[in-house]
């Protein structure tokens, strides 16, 4: 097996990476999003600290792909699976059978639900922290990851299928058609969809395919400007690592790369905690990601809801700064869009030491 060169963060970024400071923090971005319509004011209580609860939740879904983003390595198997996660929020917001707003958080390669609710290192459980500020979140393990169902072969799903499954979950959230073991289900009037890394691409596909969300947030994802590093990495994983995987599940990068390349200004405890939780990826997702860019560019202009785009200012791992700055233009049909660069943060924006800004009023 030919070994692919392992790069440090600085090598992956390249010598021409530029530094740009933006003083607007992520929590301030969310506040701005409230006023611009991405997050509805009725669904968020002002910043006074509140208590938070986390409720285990399960959704029954079918692994189908009715989106325009085709599966590249085989068809979705059409089977029924359980998607598991948690709804987090202030007790008052979850006390009745109806609530105003929930934000669904999707993740990218190598990750899992922990991307948005990391336990064990204080201050990095994003869902819990924003719950204390009045926001309701759904974090989950997507199909093929963590505690959720896994197709027998990881080639039997793809980004389009993950978007379809997300659409199913959104409809179930709106109608209370899911399982909360210890309490009645809640019907949510408004749903915002957020995604990190290729979870952002899945969120984008969901948005233009089904047009059933009230706002879209992309974190560390752009549809253009891909670096030589990520092009080589994706190609190697799709055509070599996945080809050699009998199960159809594979890591995108090595353990050494995971511990160095996507992190910037990060507490070593966070790196160790996330490395211990790292998941393999369904190869159908790895193989479908590049091809999904075609419908992205063709159909993203159909997205009419507000769009918030977030990057770490020190993240040029996957896309160039030019590609990041051009992302707003992909959403020409949205009447309200904004791009924000987070100071001293890398690809895993939520795990940089500036993560405290996520919950700052």
For each feature predicted by the language model, list its residue ranges.
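Alpha/beta-hydrolase active-site loop
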Residues: 156-185
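Conserved alpha/beta-hydrolase "acid-adjacent" motif
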Residues: 316-325
């Amino acid at each position: 097996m030919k070994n692919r060169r392992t790069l440090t963060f600085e090598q992956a970024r390249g010598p021409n990476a530029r530094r740009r400071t933006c003083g607007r923090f992520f929590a301030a971005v969310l506040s701005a999003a409230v006023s611009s319509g991405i997050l509805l004011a009725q669904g968020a209580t002002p910043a006074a600290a509140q208590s938070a609860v986390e409720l285990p939740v399960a959704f029954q879904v079918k692994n189908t792909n009715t989106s325009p983003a085709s599966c590249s390595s085989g068809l979705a198997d059409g089977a029924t699976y359980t998607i598991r996660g948690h709804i987090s929020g202030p007790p008052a917001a979850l006390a009745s059978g109806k609530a105003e707003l929930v934000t669904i958080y999707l993740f990218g390669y190598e990750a899992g639900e922990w991307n948005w609710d990391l336990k064990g290192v204080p201050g990095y459980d994003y869902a819990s922290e924003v719950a204390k500020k009045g926001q309701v979140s759904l974090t989950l393990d997507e199909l093929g990851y963590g505690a959720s169902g896994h197709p027998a072969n990881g080639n039997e799903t793809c980004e389009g299928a993950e978007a379809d499954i997300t659409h199913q979950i959104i409809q179930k959230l709106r109608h209370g058609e899911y399982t909360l073991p210890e309490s009645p289900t809640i019907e949510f009037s408004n749903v915002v969809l957020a995604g990190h890394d290729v979870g952002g691409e899945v969120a984008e596909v969901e948005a233009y395919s089904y047009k059933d969300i009230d706002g879209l947030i992309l974190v560390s994802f752009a549809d253009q400007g891909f670096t030589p590093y990520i092009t080589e990495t994706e190609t190697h994983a799709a055509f070599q690592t996945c080809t050699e995987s009998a199960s159809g599940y594979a890591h995108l990068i090595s353990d050494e790369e995971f511990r160095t390349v996507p992190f910037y200004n990060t507490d070593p405890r966070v790196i160790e905690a996330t490395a211990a939780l790292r998941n393999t990826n369904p190869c159908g997702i790895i193989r479908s990601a590049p091809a999904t860019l075609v419908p992205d560019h063709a159909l993203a202009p159909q997205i009419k809801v507000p769009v918030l785009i977030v990057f770490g200012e020190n993240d040029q791992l996957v896309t160039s700064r030019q590609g990041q700055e051009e992302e707003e233009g992909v959403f020409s049909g949205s009447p309200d869009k904004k791009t924000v660069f987070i100071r001293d943060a890398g690809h895993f924006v939520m795990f940089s030491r500036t993560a405290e800004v996520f919950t700052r009023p």
